[in-house]
Amino acid sequence: MTFLFTPHSTSVIPLQGSDYVFPVHRIYCVGQNYSDHVKEMGGDPRENPPVFFSKPSDAVVIDNKPVTYPPATSNLHYEVELVVALASGGSNISVENALAHVLGYAVGIDFTRRDLQAEAKKQGRPWDAAKGFDQSAPTSAIRLVNGGNHPLEGTISLSVNGETRQDAKLSDMIWSVPEIIRELSLYFELKAGDLIFTGTPAGVSAVVAGDQISAEIDGVGEISFELVSN
């Protein structure tokens, strides 16, 4: 068998304190997983449960590299999120066994073309153009789980040009990490190399080219990069 053209390279993420890298298989994302964020977007947490969507694996940006402001939007929003990196997968995974599949955690930014998302919601259409564009998933190095130490209660925060915009607790999530893995595995066969962006707290807003974005999660790591002009 001969390839018609050279296959695209696999996106990889570095591991903290290791020469190994994590090959990305798929990127799953959870929306509406913090009550305060659901409310700031005009929803009701009791009527709007968390939802799943995805991004292409090559949306990942690593090593604090600059991120290019995307075309076709005038309202680009940041969303800081805890990212789960899976070492193994399966289907119908129980809540009790879910964390056994986790390799580690990272800090991620789910960039969103908010104007396109609002229009998609109004029309009842998918969010692909709003969520799955190039460089829409900057991600820090992955911190490996050591001795079962899962950082599920620390602080998650984001600042723009030194001003804090998002500041919350991971324990504020509606669905916990084990519950997210359980729910996803009902719909998809999860695999090693999958990333799961677990949702963002309140405080999202627009950014422009020239802004410096920094985010941190206790016990996981940090990420910092500049948003640059196209």
Segment roles from a protein language model:
Residues M1-Y187, K191, L195, G203-N230:
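Catalytic-core "active-site belt" of small-molecule-metabolizing enzymes
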